[in-house]
Amino acid sequence: MDPMEVFKIEVTGEEEYGAKKYREIIMDILQDLGLIRSIGRLYVYVDITIPVFAVYGLLRSGIPPLTVKDVGDVMRVGGGHQIKINDEEHMADLLKALWKRYGRERVEQPARDVVIIASDTPPSDLMVTDMEAEFLQDLTDALVRIAPEGFRNRRNVMTKDSFFFIAAEESIKPELISEIEEKIREMENA
Amino acid sequence: MLEPVMFTGGLYKHDLVLELVEDLGGYILQKNVTQTEIILLLLVPSEDMNALEILSRELRGELVRAPLAGTEVAVVTPTLAIHHLPHVACDTAEYLRRHGSKTNMIGMARGVGREIAQINEYETALINEHDAAVFIFGNFGDCIKKKEQLYRNISVPVIVTGGPKMKKEDLPYAFGYVPSIGRMAHRTRKATEIATLDNIVEMVGRALDQTRAAITKDPLTTSPPRVMDAVREQVPEVEFSYSPLPIALNLNGVRVKLPYQLYKDKLAAVTFDEGVRLGEVATIRPSRMKDYILVRILPSSETGFVF
């Protein structure tokens, strides 16, 4: 079963096998990169006679940025605040953010999972990392991996809630873009 | 007739196997030690097979037929990028290795795309040094048809693999086509996928049999394993080569992994028991692979004798 609401793939010519296999490849790659839950609808259009490969997707609601209280517990201690880290994955980003806000001399790490800040303002709402930017980076990586390798001319338009990716062997002309947009609209309305 | 087999067992007492094979007049093609395990690729006279089977049972080893032993197969992908590797190409290469062949993976510089795919003279020559080549293509039938130009000039049998089913007449330059193994992003683990790998091995085996049959019509002056044995004995430096297989066997010769300029004369001077020198019965030339030496044994029609 697809975890996405809509996942349509259309390939021109007698390429049913290719369509079926590309469906598997897309699912495998999105699953590998942990992106599958963030994509709501996906439309893939391939015309092998041109040849061109296009993907249009709608994203699920935005991902909030990761703050200090998401990665650890903040407590008031004598002389400042202590953060007990629960999720070590973002440790590097956390330290970077704390150094930037408070300065290196006021951030101390007495143990692997404990950081003490010599400051009266609690760091709870300080942003550790922008998850959305990371997600968009991963998504671009996934699209480049999914598209057949020879399709080196690429165009990728990303908005807050959608992305539109075209890859082709020859240069991408405006007529081609509008033609593909038309095809994808047809797929959406079908 | 010599039978190609693979022995897998413990390192302990494996020298008994080596001794027996030598006593029987067989050849040791490859010896791979992995910690306490050993994998031996052997050529054993078929009438004495029983003796080896008994010994391997005593040593609790496993003896299986390796139909591709003594051959070198190229597994060619359009490039070495993530789109083609690791799953399909590596699994195919590994599966061929399990059946005894020496497999080399070759990624082309500009093999990608439908209209823009190219192969150059060097790549063609390198693939031609093998006994057979497996070209790994993708999921679109149209592209597989168009990419024919990549292997049109290759003189060794070419086995094409790809996703969709294709008609034989669509690929006139290929020896055979194995469907249902196009591009994929997961490991080959399902029974159907393994069966496809079996089909590739079977097809490669058939291609090699065809080459063997062609060779028997004009037999080689001497057999490649014999050349290997003589080189190993008379050019001891070959044992110090860092390559896992210092002398790779082909159906019509061997590749010796030593620098060409330094060792070509020493190799030509290798003498057989009959008094014949290797330089008289084979051409010795630089291989396209690194700085290695390529030995191609001449057929009896050129030398006038077989020994």
Annotate each PLM feature.
Chain B
Residues M1-G9:
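Short glycine-/aliphatic-rich beta-strand segments at the starts of folded cytosolic domains
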Residues V5, Y27-V33, I54-V75:
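Conserved short beta-strand edge segments in small beta-sheet-based binding/regulatory domains
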Residues T8-L29, L52:
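Short amphipathic alpha-helix segments
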Residues G10-L11, L43-A51, L55:
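Helix N-cap motif at beta-to-alpha junctions
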Residues L16-L24, L55, L59, Y95, ...:
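Generic non-transmembrane alpha-helical segments
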Residues E47, E72-Y95:
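Short, low-order "capping/linker" segments at domain edges
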Residues T92-Y95, H99-Y263:
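Long, charge-rich C-terminal accessory regions
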Residues I247-F307:
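C-terminal, charge/polar-rich interaction regions
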